[in-house]
Design a protein with these regions (language model features):
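Formylglycine-dependent sulfatase
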Residues: 1-219
Length: 219
């Protein structure tokens, strides 16, 4: 949005409609000229192919709707084949593993050169997907409700000197600037689209929201 590539609410025409202006080069263009090795792992919400934008290695996660499948992803701009997918594939782990691989190889083969690594995880983005074993770790943590959780976290931040202010109030009228009735219907009666007080939720909503937060934490 800062370079008017993406949609700009309230501005006629809506920005560059997905095309980056010529006057907005990526930082990798300058770094490569100065001898940097450039690596990319994860999202690529930029027009053009990764390697054509002055990166040397890339793991491009296009399958953002399923954290447990590599279908549609690209390795160095080439479609990733199903037979290459490791057992128990999970997008976040695969992205981190690719980053580690790039930096390990850099230290072995290009130790004399500086590097830049653009690491962009899909998580925590909808859909909320995480390994079941990790979700279990957080299963009951959020049943206390978001009001109590935010109070506890705020108190801890004040204790360590990170904040010197008061806890903000809930703004129950603030939510997405769009409605999603189809999604609400699909997700069921446990879903809400406004940050209301925890004690205003039904038992079903509390369980549903606590589960969502547990999965979010596990991501």
């Amino acid at each position: 949005q800062q370079v008017r590539r993406d949609a700009l609410p309230g501005i006629k025409g809506g920005g560059g409609r997905g095309v980056r202006p010529k006057w907005a080069p990526l930082v990798t263009e300058f770094l490569k000229k100065d001898g940097y090795r450039n690596y990319h792992s994860g999202k690529w919400h930029i027009d053009g192919k990764v390697l054509e934008n002055d990166f040397h290695e890339s793991w491009r996660v296009n399958n953002q709707g399923n954290f447990f499948s590599s279908k549609g992803n690209l390795l160095n701009d080439i479609p990733f084949q199903p037979e290459q997918e490791p057992k128990n594939y999970y997008s976040t782990t695969a992205t981190a593993s690719h980053a580690i691989k790039c930096l390990t190889e850099h230290s072995q083969d290009h130790a004399d050169k500086p590097f830049f690594h653009y690491l962009a995880f899909i998580a925590p983005h909808f859909p909320l997907h995480a390994p079941q074993k990790v979700i279990q770790k957080y299963k009951n943590r959020y049943l206390a409700g978001w009001d109590k959780m935010r109070e506890q976290r705020f108190a801890k931040q004040k204790k360590i000197g990170l904040l010197n202010t008061t806890l903000s109030k809930l703004e129950p009228e603030v939510g997405p600037p769009y409605s999603f009735p189809d999604a609400i219907q699909k997700l069921g009666p446990g879903e809400i689209n406004r940050p209301v007080a925890w004690n205003q939720l039904s038992k079903e909503q509390k369980i549903f929201q606590a589960t969502k937060m547990a999965i979010h934490a596990a991501m």
